[in-house]
């Protein structure tokens, strides 16, 4: 098994560990040995315990002490996730995929992705670096998600949609097919996007 530490001792971090543990349990050859959390929040001290796993210290401390470990960044805010990825660029960032996600074998996805339980990623879809696809979200066929995109639970990105980098979809939002969502845009809970929108648009 390969050592893995989680950045972010919080709800998303707990979900990541739960997903890894379930994946390990279902595998004949478990892949990951979870060694703990790294977190810069000063409320955490090195050696603390968070729900059964040790705090390894700050990001820099964990990176120094475990230089060969893989890292999963369990941070929902896109800009913060991007910053952490730069800071820890010497590590590898595996994708974590829930056993109950449905992913087409023709799907391309890159490092650091998280695909939650019940998510569906259809044929021909492309997922960029450090993408989050939340529980029961759907990426329809031939859609493209850029880097550091976060799809909240129940979100639907329709067929052929191009989602540029750093876009946030909150729960149960959706798009029409074959449109473009500009870089840095925010789609709020339950909102639908009917036509292409430019960068940094809030819907």
Language-model features and meaning:
Residues 42-102:
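Phosphate-bearing ligand-interacting subdomains
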Residues 25-46:
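NAD(P)-binding Rossmann-fold cofactor-contacting core
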Residues 20-24, 88-90:
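Short, solvent-exposed amphipathic alpha-helical segments in soluble enzyme
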Residues 2-21:
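Glycine-rich adenosine-cofactor-binding loop
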Residues 96-203:
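Structural signal for interior beta-strand "rungs" in well-ordered beta-sheet cores
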Residues 14, 18, 82, 195:
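Alpha-helical elements of the RecA-like P-loop NTPase motor core of helicases
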Residues 6-7, 38, 74, 188:
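Short hydrophobic segments within beta-strands
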């Amino acid at each position: 098994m390969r050592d893995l530490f989680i950045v972010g001792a919080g709800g998303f971090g707990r979900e990541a560990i739960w997903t890894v543990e379930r994946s390990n349990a279902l595998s004949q050859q478990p892949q990951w040995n979870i060694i703990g959390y790294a977190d810069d929040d000063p409320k955490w001290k090195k050696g603390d315990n968070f729900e059964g796993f040790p705090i390894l210290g700050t990001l820099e401390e964990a990176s120094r002490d475990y230089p060969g470990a893989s890292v999963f960044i369990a941070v929902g805010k896109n800009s913060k996730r991007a910053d952490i990825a730069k800071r820890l660029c010497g590590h590898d960032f595996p994708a974590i995929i829930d056993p109950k996600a449905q992913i087409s074998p023709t799907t391309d996805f890159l490092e650091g992705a998280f695909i939650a339980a019940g998510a569906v990623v259809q044929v021909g879809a492309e997922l960029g670096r450090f993408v989050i696809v939340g529980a029961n979200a759907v990426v329809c066929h031939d859609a493209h998600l850029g880097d550091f995109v976060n799809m909240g639970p129940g979100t639907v990105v329709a067929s052929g949609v191009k989602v540029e980098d750093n876009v946030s979809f909150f729960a149960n939002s959706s798009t029409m097919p074959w449109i473009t969502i500009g870089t840095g845009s925010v789609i709020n809970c339950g909102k639908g996007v009917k036509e292409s929108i430019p960068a940094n648009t809030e819907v």
